[in-house]
Amino acid sequence: YAIMETGLGGRLDSVSICTPVISVITSISLDHAEILGDTLSKITKEKVGIIKPMVPCVTINSHPDEVQTIIENECMKKKSPLIITTNSKQLLYTIGLKGNVQRENARIAELVIKTLNPTFNETYIKQGLKNVKWYGRNQIVQKQPLVIFDVAHNESGIASFINFYQLLAKGKKILIISLQSRKKINSQINAILNTFD
C-alpha cells in the first residue's frame, strides 16, 4: 500500500485522481481558508471530495456536528461505508507519540489496518505504534531545559501543541513562533498569551 496525503482539501487535490482502497478524514479546521472556504462547512465540503464511491472512509468521532453530518451525507451519497473511531479515551496500545491528537491518529491507523486486513497480526500493530516517531510534532528535543519542536500552523494544531506543552512545562515558558501572514490563529491568541511568558 501507499499512503497519499492531500495537501489541500480533497475535491481539487491532485491525490483525488487516484482510486484509493480506503479514504481517511482526520480532524478538520480552518486551514487554507482562502482557497477552501471560510467556514468549517465549506472546508468539509471540499475535504469530502476525497471520498470515492463504494470505498470505505475512516474518520474520527470528535468532529463538530455540522462536519460529521456532511461526511455522513457524502458517504451515503457515494455508498461508501463510514467507519468512525470509538469514543474511548483508552488506547489498547502504547504509542511512541505524545499528545491526545496522536492517540486519535493511532485509533485511525488501527481502524484502517483492521478494515483492509481483518486478520492482520495485532502484535505488528502494537509494535508499530510503540516505535513510531514523527519529527516536528510534539518533538522533545531537549529535556533540561525543556525544548519542544512543533510545526503546528493552524488553530487546531496550535491548540493540540498547547495542550501537550501544558502537561510538561514548568518554570519560565518561552515560545518562538513564525507563521505566514495569511494564517488565521485568532482563536488561539489568548491561549498562547496565557500559556507563555
Specify the residue positions occupied by each region the protein language model found.
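Conserved catalytic-core segment of NTP-binding enzymes
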Residues: 8-11, 18-79, 185-189
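A conserved short coil-to-beta-strand element within the FAD-binding core of flavoproteins
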Residues: 87
